[in-house]
């Protein structure tokens, strides 16, 4: 025999010796020693540990060690009174840090039902299998341990394992490999025998007793040649056999006779272990999923393993059923010459599968109690079970079942292949027979069946000569339907989908006749279509559970069919369906709801919401304040600095390039802002060279028009000759700011931040799922900033200002005193435009406008027609007393305007310091006589959450 020649050697005395098995080396992720200190042990256990260590030392299983590795060791006492030594290898077993796992070689127990019936058996157990398999020499030091001394009165004794230590991560895999190698010659020589090997337990079956004896004799020799030993006291040769926890008879397989202790079931961990054990033997017991629903329900709730659980009366009955099945259940050993069949039963909750041979039960098959999808159609469950059990049969015997029996007619099977993707997958490549005739036997009669396999009430096509009803729901809790009659239902739900679900349930209850239902909620439509035959997944949301269960009960109680379909809401499509859906929408919608929806989509600011919808300032502020993204991203702003602005649209643009890394290749965002209207346009580019700038400007021209002047920084893309030539072709003048000074581009720099903030809001808190590309995201942000948002000191959007040239400032066109810092004199001028702490002043005819801080302005107190340029007296600052007297004479509010200039100037001063809180004040006194300006302080933030018209408290809420 070649295998014997390979293993045996002849010594010089002529005696055959056994060559020791070659060890399998382990793979380590680190060579850094792992040392876990040994904990103290009681004297009794310490003495037992010394005895066990000496015993292992004599057998050659351990050796003295000076290894830098250490794992704790301890002993436990068996029922027989003997002690057992164990090593705590948890630190060494750390998969992600220390040892490389080998992976399982037998992922699951073998099925004992596949042992041919009436064949004689013999079962053996290998003695101390781990201790007969050596470790690789380089791996021994990793499994060192220490035996401590009491009171440290002497040095501790240290050893290391030379054989597979129990508890090591890869010990079972190595053991299976060694035993598998030893059995391979036996399998090759006795290929007609049925041999099962699991870890160190071996079962042999043969058609005759003589062949079994021959096989066993050869197996003994091969095992001995491999250095393994058979435990003589554990050899089984007669029935009943006990193997892998089961009892084996000549034709039957029975589960172990156990009793479930209910007094120990107190925590989630206790019930988890119990149900794990029951699931392990369910293929033998045949307990359908519906018969364990209450036990599975106990696992719901708190995921803490120590959380308290209580055995309900219903669950107690189910445990009693399990105990009865344990006492009576059995499966059959197969006939190796006959084929297997699969039966699918339409049981309650979910279908049940049974593998049979003729009329003999081989194994039960079940689906999990919990599903992944909220609704799983019963037909889809059947298809999943068929696919799952087909794979199981192939795993058991290597072949597909010969026949599959299902509770469907031939026509229903044909329709299932046409309409159900799950059915097509479950029966893919099946070449056997699909039948609906079940074998006549009593073993299946206890199963509780369901009739809800295929829809009976729900239709997939519109019904003729039936009523048409439109439904709608709103997040304000209103549900409604319209059709032959209208009805509005006030619900407790703050979800539009749940309100719509209530509307559909109400329609199904109110109309006891065939109906067609049209809803604008795709979610509700799909749920209603599937619910009739679906298994509803349990949800922690009790309200949702109640709604879905009520919907299913309502559908199943109906006597007349219905059809439900989806229609898109808020479209401009013509036709009666759109109009009828709008009518249903009007029953539940309001301006507030629409404002909330727009903000969720675009994150428009308060003033923009107030301008677009008929809502109050408080309602608009509440919408923005309840938006998580707008609160997180609403950062304090700083004044933009001294930057001359255009006096009309397209007079002066500022342009810059910013970066958005999430856009990938298109991360270069070219931004242009009109300094008069604040209209913004931006494009995504792959760079910032001159060609990219030109491409961006052409896009700006198409949207904004052509400017007179553009201001940029000193970047190479803006200073190139090609760019200057491009501007000259379009008759555009070009200026640049001071190099390395971002304040020269303060307006566009502020715009960059505003644009990025809007992008983040829409990405992390937006409801739009269609903006997938960078340019689409950018366009949505630009739409919000230009056409929806209204900024402080404005009454119109930037787009309206840019297209119409409409002015916002109430001070424009008024005569003022302005201070000339060069001459230190006060001059008379006229305000051209006003904003952000600065004003553009016209000194006189044929003179260029001047930009000055508003703190250098005072309103002129004489009639406009009498205004003349000052002489010596005019170089003095106008006195407030004059203003007061003129105020009293004319009855106007110019004094207020003067205070406004001082307040805004003061805010502008603060804006230039580190202590500036980015809030400027503007007084807008409503009637003469008010002396408390703080009551009318307005916020200066461009995207003020209070719309710039709130009380003084706005300052803290916006900051």
From Swiss-Prot:
Binding residues for Mg(2+) 1: 472, 500, 520
Biased composition (Polar residues): 872-884
Pfam family, one: IN_DBD_C
EC number per UniProt: 2.7.7.49, 3.1.26.4
InterPro entries tied to this protein: DNA/RNA_pol_sf (IPR043502), Integrase-like_N (IPR017856), Integrase_C_dom_sf_retrovir (IPR036862), Integrase_C_retrovir (IPR001037), Integrase_cat-core (IPR001584), Integrase_Zn-bd_dom_N (IPR003308), Rev_trsase/Diguanyl_cyclase (IPR043128), RNaseH-like_sf (IPR012337)
Biological processes per GO annotation: DNA integration; DNA recombination; DNA synthesis involved in DNA repair; DNA-templated DNA replication
Reverse transcriptase domain segment(s): 57-248
Residue numbers binding Mg(2+) 2: 472, 585
Domain of life: Eukaryota
Zinc finger (Integrase-type): 590-631
Residue ranges: DNA binding: 814-862
Keywords tagged on the record: DNA integration, DNA recombination, DNA-binding, Endonuclease, ERV, Hydrolase, Metal-binding, Multifunctional enzyme, Nuclease, Nucleotidyltransferase, RNA-directed DNA polymerase, Transferase, Transposable element, Zinc, Zinc-finger
SUPFAM superfamilies: DNA-binding domain of retroviral integrase (SSF50122), DNA/RNA polymerases (SSF56672), N-terminal Zn binding domain of HIV integrase (SSF46919), Ribonuclease H-like (SSF53098)
Gene3D superfamilies: 1.10.10.200, 3.30.70.270, HIV Type 1 Reverse Transcriptase, subunit A, domain 1, Integrase, C-terminal domain superfamily, retroviral, Ribonuclease H-like superfamily/Ribonuclease H
Entry's Gene Ontology molecular function annotations: DNA binding; RNA-directed DNA polymerase activity; RNA-DNA hybrid ribonuclease activity; zinc ion binding
Start and end residues of each RNase H type-1 domain: 463-593
Domain named Integrase catalytic: residues: 645-806
Motif window: LPQG: 164-167
Binding site for Zn(2+): 599, 603, 627, 630
Catalytic activity line of the entry: DNA(n) + a 2'-deoxyribonucleoside 5'-triphosphate = DNA(n+1) + diphosphate; Endonucleolytic cleavage to 5'-phosphomonoester
Residue segments, region Disordered: 867-893, 898-917
Family that this chain belongs to: Belongs to the beta type-B retroviral polymerase family. HERV class-II K(HML-2) pol subfamily.
Domain notes: The LPQG and YXDD motifs are catalytically important and conserved among many retroviruses.
Other information: This protein is synthesized as Gag-Pro and Gag-Pro-Pol polyprotein precursors. These polyproteins are thought, by similarity with type-B retroviruses, to be generated by -1 frameshifts occurring at the Gag-Pro and Pro-Pol genes boundaries. Exact N-terminus of this protein has not been formally described.
Stated name of the protein: Endogenous retrovirus group K member 113 Pol protein
Species assigned in the record: Homo sapiens
């Amino acid at each position: 025999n070649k295998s014997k020649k390979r293993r045996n050697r002849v010594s010089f005395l002529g005696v055959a010796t056994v060559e020791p098995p070659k060890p399998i080396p382990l793979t380590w992720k680190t060579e850094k020693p792992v040392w876990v200190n040994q904990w103290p042990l009681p004297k009794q256990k310490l003495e037992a540990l010394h005895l066990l260590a000496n015993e292992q030392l004599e057998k050659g299983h351990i050796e003295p060690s000076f290894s830098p590795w250490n794992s704790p060791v301890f002993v436990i006492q068996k029922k027989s009174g003997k002690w057992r030594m164990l090593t705590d290898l948890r630190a060494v077993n750390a998969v992600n840090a220390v040892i490389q796992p080998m992976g399982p070689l037998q992922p699951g127990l073998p099925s004992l039902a596949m042992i041919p019936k009436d064949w004689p058996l013999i079962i053996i157990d290998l003695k101390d299998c781990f201790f007969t398999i050596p470790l690789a020499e380089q791996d021994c030091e990793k499994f060192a341990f220490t035996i401590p001394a009491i009171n440290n009165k002497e040095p501790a004794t240290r050893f290391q394992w030379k054989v597979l230590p129990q508890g090591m991560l890869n010990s079972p895999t190595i053991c299976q490999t060694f035993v598998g190698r030893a059995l391979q010659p036996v399998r090759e020589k006795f290929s007609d025998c049925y041999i099962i090997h699991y870890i160190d337990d071996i079962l042999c079956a043969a058609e005759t007793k003589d062949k079994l004896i021959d096989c066993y004799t050869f197996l003994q020799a091969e095992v001995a040649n491999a250095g393994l030993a058979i435990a003589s006291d554990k050899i089984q040769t007669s029935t009943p056999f006990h193997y892998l926890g089961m009892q084996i008879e000549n034709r039957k397989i029975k589960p172990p006779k156990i009793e479930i202790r209910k007094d120990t079931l107190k925590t989630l961990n206790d019930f988890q272990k119990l149900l794990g054990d029951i699931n392990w033997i369910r293929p033998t017991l045949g307990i359908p999923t519906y018969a364990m629903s209450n036990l599975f329900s106990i696992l719901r709730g708190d995921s803490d393993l120590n959380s308290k659980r209580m055995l309900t009366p219903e669950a107690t009955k189910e445990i009693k059923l399990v105990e009865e099945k344990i006492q009576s259940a059995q499966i059959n050993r197969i006939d190796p010459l006959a084929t297997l069949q699969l039966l699918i039963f339409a049981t309650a909750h979910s279908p049940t599968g049974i593998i049979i041979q003729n009329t003999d039960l081989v194994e039960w098959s079940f689906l999990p109690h919990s599903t992944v999808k909220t609704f799983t159609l019963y037909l889809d469950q059947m298809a999943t079970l068929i696919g799952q059990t087909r794979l199981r049969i192939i795993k058991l015997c290597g072949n597909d079942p010969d026949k599959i029996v299902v509770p469907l007619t031939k026509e229903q099977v044909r329709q299932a292949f046409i309409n159900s993707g799950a059915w097509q997958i479950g029966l893919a490549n099946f070449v056997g027979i699909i039948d609906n005739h079940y074998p006549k036997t009593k073993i299946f009669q206890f199963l509780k069946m369901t009739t809800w396999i295929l829809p009976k009430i729900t239709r997939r096509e519109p019904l003729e000569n039936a009523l048409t009803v439109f439904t709608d729901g709103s997040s304000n809790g209103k549900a409604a339907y319209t059709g032959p009659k209208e009805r509005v239902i006030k619900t407790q739900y703050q979800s539009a989908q749940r309100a719509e679900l209530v509307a559909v349930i109400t329609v199904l209850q109110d109309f006891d006749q065939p109906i067609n239902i049209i809803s604008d909620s795709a979610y509700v439509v799909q749920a209603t279509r599937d619910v009739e035959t679906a298994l509803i997944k349990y949800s922690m949301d009790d309200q949702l559970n109640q709604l879905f269960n009520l919907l299913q009960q309502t559908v199943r109680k109906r006597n007349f069919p219905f059809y439900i379909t989806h229609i898109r809401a808020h479209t401009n499509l013509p036709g009666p369906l759109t109009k009828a859906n709008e009518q249903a929408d009007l029953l539940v919608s309001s301006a507030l709801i629409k404002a909330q929806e727009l903000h969720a989509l675009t994150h428009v600011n308060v003033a923009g919401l107030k301008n677009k919808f008929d809502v109050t300032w408080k309602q608009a502020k509440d919408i923005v304040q309840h938006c998580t993204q707008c609160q997180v991203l609403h950062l304090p702003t700083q004044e933009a600095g001294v930057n001359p602005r255009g006096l009309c649209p397209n007079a002066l643009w500022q342009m810059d390039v910013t970066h958005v890394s999430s856009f990938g290749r298109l991360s270069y965002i070219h931004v242009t802002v009109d300094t008069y209207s604040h209209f913004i346009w931006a494009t995504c580019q792959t760079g910032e060279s001159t060609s990219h700038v030109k491409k961006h400007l052409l896009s700006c021209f198409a949207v904004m028009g052509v400017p007179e002047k553009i201001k940029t920084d000193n970047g190479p893309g803006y200073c190139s000759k090609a760019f200057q030539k491009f501007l000259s072709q379009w008759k555009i003048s070009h200026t640049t700011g001071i190099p390395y000074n971002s304040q020269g581009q303060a307006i566009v720099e502020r715009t960059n931040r505003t644009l990025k903030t809007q992008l983040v809001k829409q990405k992390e808190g937006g409801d739009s799922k269609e903006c997938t590309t960078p340019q689409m995201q950018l366009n949505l942000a630009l739409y919000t900033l230009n056409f929806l948002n209204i900024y402080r000191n404005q009454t119109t959007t930037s787009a309206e200002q840019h297209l119409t040239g409409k002015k916002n400032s109430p001070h424009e066109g008024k005569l003022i005193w302005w201070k000339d810092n060069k001459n230190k004199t006060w001059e008379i001028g006229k305000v051209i435009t006003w904003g952000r702490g600065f004003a553009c002043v016209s000194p006189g005819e044929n003179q260029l406008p001047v930009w000055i801080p508003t703190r250098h302005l005072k309103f002129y107190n004489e009639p406009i027609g009498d205004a003349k340029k000052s002489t010596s007296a005019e170089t003095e600052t106008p006195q407030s007393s004059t203003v007061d007297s003129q105020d009293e004479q004319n009855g106007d509010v110019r004094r207020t305007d003067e205070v406004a200039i001082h307040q805004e100037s003061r805010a502008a001063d603060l804006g230039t310091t580190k202590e500036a809180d980015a809030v400027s004040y503007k007084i807008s006194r409503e009637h003469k006589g008010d002396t408390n300006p703080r009551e009318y302080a307005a916020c200066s933030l461009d995207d003020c959450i209070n719309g710039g018209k709130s009380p003084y408290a706005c300052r803290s809420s916006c900051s």
